[in-house]
Structures are given as C-alpha cells and as structure tokens.
C-alpha cells in the first residue's frame, strides 16, 4: 500500500471517495457504492430529517364513521339449556343411585 501524504486531509486521501456520485438507485451494486449508500440503502438507516406523513382528511360525505352496527341474531346455545349446575346435581344423584344397587 502506498504511503499517504500526512498533510492531506482524510477525506481527500486517494480512494476515500468513490469516483461516481451517489444516486437514488437501490440495486445491489448501488447499495455497495460507498459507506453512506450502504447505511442508507442497504440497512435502511438514515439520520437525516424525517418527512412528515400527511394525514388524509375525512370525506365530507362520511360523518365521522358513525355508521350503526347491524343487529345480529343471538347465538343459539348448544347442549343442556338448564345449565351446568343442574347437570352436576343429576350426575351426583345418578352416582348415589348406582352405589345403592
């Protein structure tokens, strides 16, 4: 490796800057163009100013999206309609009857 002139600034050293300028292309070659391109394009890290995302205004026809919810039929219950408490009592009474036999 050739010795570098000590009076030269680091950013002016030979090979410190690419021969072509950076562009907005995201292809594999352009992602490896320089360290800045690699950070921005390859890794998606940018320390620049963030752009504001514009919020879309609500259309005039909609009133705050306050549409009524359509009524749905109640779900039908399956199994024993009397509930689990009475079924436990029935099981207990059957168990007592079996013990007596």
UniProtKB/Swiss-Prot annotation:
Pfam families recorded: Tat
Keyword set, alphabetical order: Acetylation, Activator, AIDS, Apoptosis, Host cytoplasm, Host nucleus, Host-virus interaction, Inhibition of host innate immune response by virus, Inhibition of host interferon signaling pathway by virus, Interferon antiviral system evasion, Isopeptide bond, Metal-binding, Methylation, Modulation of host chromatin by virus, Modulation of host PP1 activity by virus, Phosphoprotein, RNA-binding, Secreted, Transcription, Transcription regulation, Ubl conjugation, Viral immunoevasion, Zinc
Molecular function per GO: actinin binding; cyclin binding; metal ion binding; protein domain specific binding; protein serine/threonine phosphatase inhibitor activity; RNA-binding transcription regulator activity; trans-activation response element binding
Modified residues (Asymmetric dimethylarginine): 52
UniProt region (Core), positions on chain: 38-48
Ranges annotated as biased composition (Basic residues): 48-57
Modified residues (N6-acetyllysine): 28, 50-51
GO BP terms in the entry: DNA-templated transcription; positive regulation of transcription elongation by RNA polymerase II; positive regulation of viral transcription; symbiont-mediated perturbation of host chromatin organization; symbiont-mediated suppression of host innate immune response; symbiont-mediated suppression of host translation initiation; symbiont-mediated suppression of host type I interferon-mediated signaling pathway
Annotated segments matching region Interaction with human CREBBP: 1-24
Compartment list: Host nucleus, Host nucleolus; Host cytoplasm; Secreted
Domain remark in the UniProt entry: The cell attachment site mediates the interaction with ITGAV/ITGB3 and ITGA5/ITGB1 integrins, leading to vascular cell migration and invasion. This interaction also provides endothelial cells with the adhesion signal they require to grow in response to mitogens. The Cys-rich region may bind 2 zinc ions. This region is involved in binding to KAT5.
Full protein name: Protein Tat
Organism name: Human immunodeficiency virus type 1 group M subtype G (isolate SE6165) (HIV-1)
């Amino acid at each position: 490796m050739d010795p570098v002139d000590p009076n030269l600034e680091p950013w002016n050293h030979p090979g410190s800057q690419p021969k072509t300028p950076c562009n907005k292309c995201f292809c594999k070659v352009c992602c490896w163009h320089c360290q800045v391109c690699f950070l921005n394009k390859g890794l998606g890290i940018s320390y620049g100013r963030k752009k504001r995302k514009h919020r879309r205004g609500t259309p005039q026809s909609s009133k705050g999206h306050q549409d009524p919810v359509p009524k749905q039929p109640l779900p039908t219950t399956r199994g024993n309609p009397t509930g689990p408490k009475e079924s436990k009592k029935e099981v207990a009474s059957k168990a007592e009857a079996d013990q007596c036999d």
